[in-house]
Amino acid sequence: EVPISISTKLIKLLAITRMPFSSASLLPIFLVASYFYSINIETISIVNLCLCSLGVLFAHLSTNMFNDYFDNIDGTDKGNFNYFQQVSGGSRAIELGLISIPKTKSIATLLSLIAIIFGTMTLFSTHNSNIFTVVIITITALLLGYFYTAPPIRLVARNGLGELSIFTVFGPLLILGTSFSIYNGDFLTSNYFIDLLLLSVPVGLLTTNILLINEFPDYEGDLKTGKNHLVATFGKKNSRYIYLFNLVIISLVTFYSATILNPILFLPFLFILIYGTKITIHIF
């Protein structure tokens, strides 16, 4: 038997969990931390920031694997022949023989349990007035992530509900959930709630646009298997305008936030504008 090196195992782990995409869930957390740091570092719990980051990371990896599992079960991945394109969705780890279907489900379940453990640990040092809200947000986010592809709800096939759930999870739920978890005080009644609620809009829409772009190369295969996301519902031509509309809202809200919150936000505004315009030109 040929021994497998640690580096090969690590690459395999990165592939089957789609770990590089976890930046979509970690960057909003760091954005919240940066916001509070610019005000006063003592306003947040560093311990909870670390626990929250780990919990969200494992929850995201678990969701990725559950999505691959259910996409394979319902035949979505088997019907997609464009998976070597850079922006095609899914890891294709099962199709490529990197992991079996039962093992995918087992690891996804294990990662979920680890995420729940970190989430529970966070509650022990969360401000009393924020605990209930953190629990509700966490449960909601986990359910939306799981039922994104899981039957019987399968949000991804509900003509736009999948994209709405992605916006909700990676925008308001993640930004506000992190804030409630790490803020040393009653966050809902604080002066920071509206600021971060506003910031959650471009963050959520940015992730939604990334998802939208991934749906374009999967269009034909997803349509055949009943995965009726926005691109499958409205077609490639019309979906371009959905992407453009989201980009305009992202740019406007980010620009407004930069003018009233912190001028440093002009940097991501410029990045979003330049990169978003590049993609817009490509799809049009």
Where are these predicted regions, by residue range?
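Acidic (Asp/Glu-rich) catalytic motifs at the cytosolic membrane interface
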Residues: 58-84, 208-231
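Helix-coil boundary and interhelical linker segments in multi-pass alpha-helical membrane proteins
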Residues: 33-54, 117-135, 174-201, 253-265
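Extended hydrophobic alpha-helices typical of membrane-associated regions
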Residues: 259-284
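Functional transmembrane core segments of multi-pass inner-membrane proteins
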Residues: 164-219, 237
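Multi-pass membrane catalytic core of lipid/isoprenoid biosynthesis enzymes
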Residues: 81-125, 228-261
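Intramembrane alpha-helical segments
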Residues: 90-186
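Topogenic membrane-insertion module of multi-pass membrane proteins
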Residues: 1-51, 55, 59, 63, ...
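Membrane-embedded alpha-helical segments that form the functional core of polytopic membrane enzymes
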Residues: 29-30, 42-72, 133-146, 191-213
